[in-house]
């Protein structure tokens, strides 16, 4: 599959690198307003190709997206000093208006994969601007938060995180909901596994893992300025599910007809991903506290999305 990437910064280039390492894409085209950056990133990544795959990695312009099955959008503007979140969203909506039009002019059949933050709102904006069915506009959502949740649980339980089945729902941000009540390890409920393994999940353990998930980005940004490897791998994982029609269950964002009593809101739940995009939404059974938290998260996202004209 040919993959286009808008934005050759840290996230865009990390996703291109992950796609190359995994051999998922036959061709990757990087587009950025800074053409020198796009060219340099493409050249650097292409030098890794002989070691791992046969992917063609190059820089180009929007017209070079022709025939792409997926286009990752990681473009956006940075927040100015004194600028409100709403003002920033308005400027990013304007960027997306230009980007989405040019992407679809070249690749009208592509699935859009949104990585720009705040990703849920930008997914909503991209859906409105594109006129595409929500199933074809996918935000990275809580795929990284879910990976962090599983990683921390696996580390505590001394089990492979790939055997941990637990999800983060709602916003990719402060109001996200860690779905503890239905977390599983293999075929065993989390609390049962923890008891059998002699690793009880106490309130203190839950609190530490919750904080570890919520504040992971802050810790990484403090140390190195940005996060990009994790989300780059997450984006590659979504593309893999599409390219191979794997029908995998991944926690991604999309405009949802109804979630926790809120209509037409972009938020994350587990979703089945295949060659045509989102095939099915899966809303897990939650306890009362989690249901209330998810409703609050969905309402906050809906209100914020409505405040952004596009």
Swiss-Prot record:
List, alphabetically, the Pfam families matched: Ldh_1_C (PF02866), Ldh_1_N (PF00056)
The active site is formed by 172 (proton acceptor)
Q: Which Gene3D superfamilies does the entry link to?
A: Lactate dehydrogenase/glycoside hydrolase, family 4, C-terminal, NAD(P)-binding Rossmann-like Domain
Q: Does the keyword NAD apply?
A: yes
* Positions contributing to beta-D-fructose 1,6-bisphosphate binding: 150, 165
The record's principal subcellular location, in a coarse class, is cytoplasm
EC number, UniProt record: 1.1.1.27
| UniProt keyword annotations, A-Z | Allosteric enzyme, Cytoplasm, NAD, Oxidoreductase
Q: Which InterPro entries does the record cross-reference, listed alphabetically?
A: L-lactate/malate_DH, L-lactate_DH, L-lactate_DH_AS, Lactate/malate_DH_C, Lactate/malate_DH_N, Lactate_DH/Glyco_Ohase_4_C, NAD(P)-bd_dom_sf
Q: Name one GO biological process term.
A: lactate metabolic process
Please give the subunit comment from the record: Homotetramer.
The similarity comment for this entry is: Belongs to the LDH/MDH superfamily. LDH family.
Cross-referenced PANTHER family, in alphabetical order? L-2-HYDROXYCARBOXYLATE DEHYDROGENASE (NAD(P)(+)), L-LACTATE DEHYDROGENASE
What this protein is called in its record is: L-lactate dehydrogenase
Q: Which organism encodes this protein?
A: Allorhizobium ampelinum (strain ATCC BAA-846 / DSM 112012 / S4) (Agrobacterium vitis (strain S4))
Query: Which taxonomic lineage is given here?
Result: Bacteria, Pseudomonadati, Pseudomonadota, Alphaproteobacteria, Hyphomicrobiales
Gene it is expressed from: ldh
